[in-house]
Amino acid sequence: MMTRESIDKRAGRRGPNLNIVLTCPECKVYPPKIVERFSEGDVVCALCGLVLSDKLVDTRSEWRTFSNDDHNGDDPSRVGEASNPLLDGNNLSTRIGKGETTDMRFTKELNKAQGKNVMDKKDNEVQAAFAKITMLCDAAELPKIVKDCAKEAYKLCHDEKTLKGKSMESIMAASILIGCRRAEVARTFKEIQSLIHVKTKEFGKTLNIMKNILRGKSEDGFLKIDTDNMSGAQNLTYIPRFCSHLGLPMQVTTSAEYTAKKCKEIKEIAGKSPITIAVVSIYLNILLFQIPITAAKVGQTLQVTEGTIKSGYKILYEHRDKLVDPQLIANGVVSLDNLPGVEKK
């Protein structure tokens, strides 16, 4: 029988071996054959079966449940459902499983009855709205941060008295738009409106009401609503998307971003909405690079009136020397002479 001393001697080790090794006091075999039996919580010698330790804590990863695991009638999950901080309930409730019974109809009826008793009615309504918000955000290809911010905004506002009488669609539309602005994801008022098909007047009123509510609740919740950022995303965030819709090259996009940055220095245009500044900056660079796209086409594609584009262009034309990257002019890429003049009244 091999002993600890004989193994150390054969390996050529010198000095005392300070390693602590659990060995079986009955077998005294080295190296020991110790087995951890997590099902019973015991540490057992594999040779003689002597229990060396009990009450063993299972340090392995928890079992998980996937969408179709319960079809076989056996659910290995021990951890339960993850809690949702957006819901009022504490998510600790009893559920009726399928089990091994053959009467599936009885099981479904029992599960339904249990759900009516345990589930909070308010949570059911909120969960239905969350599912709708998720579906709409997925349709618009919005990131998860927007979904979370929209759900938080809806949760904070949906049961307020000031929103009574407002349609569910307008509240969800306002929540998604607030979520976009909170997450600094560029989406316009009209884009969200076309996504949900809600009337402009009702949408606008609901949005203003929810803004006022959130200003008073901005310090609550796990997602703080920053009301200072709710005036609209910066105009630079719109330009790449708008240029993509128009099929413009990257050089035009970069030049339009330069123009939009410089617009902050012009008092006549600085007070305009970020969308207007973005569209007008793009239109000026379309003319600068002599791309055959009309103002009517730009307005139709980006959902801005042609009059708004032309009136904004008149302001930019007066300050054209400040709005075009001088490096492009120095390299001969563009010329200010490419910009058509504006008739003065």
Curated annotation (Swiss-Prot):
Any one GO biological process: RNA polymerase II preinitiation complex assembly
InterPro entries, alphabetized: Cyclin-like_dom (IPR013763), Cyclin-like_sf (IPR036915), TFIIB (IPR000812), TFIIB_CS (IPR023486), TFIIB_cyclin (IPR013150), Znf_TFIIB (IPR013137)
Keywords: Metal-binding, Nucleus, Repeat, Transcription, Transcription regulation, Zinc, Zinc-finger
Transmembrane segments: none
Sequence repeat segments: 136-212, 242-318
Amino acids binding Zn(2+): C24, C27, C45, C48
Zinc finger (TFIIB-type) boundaries: 20-53
Protein's job: General factor that plays a major role in the activation of eukaryotic genes transcribed by RNA polymerase II.
Similarity section: Belongs to the TFIIB family.
Subunit (UniProt): Associates with TFIID-IIA (DA complex) to form TFIID-IIA-IIB (DAB-complex) which is then recognized by polymerase II.
Protein name in UniProt: Transcription initiation factor IIB
Annotated source species: Saccharomyces cerevisiae (strain ATCC 204508 / S288c)
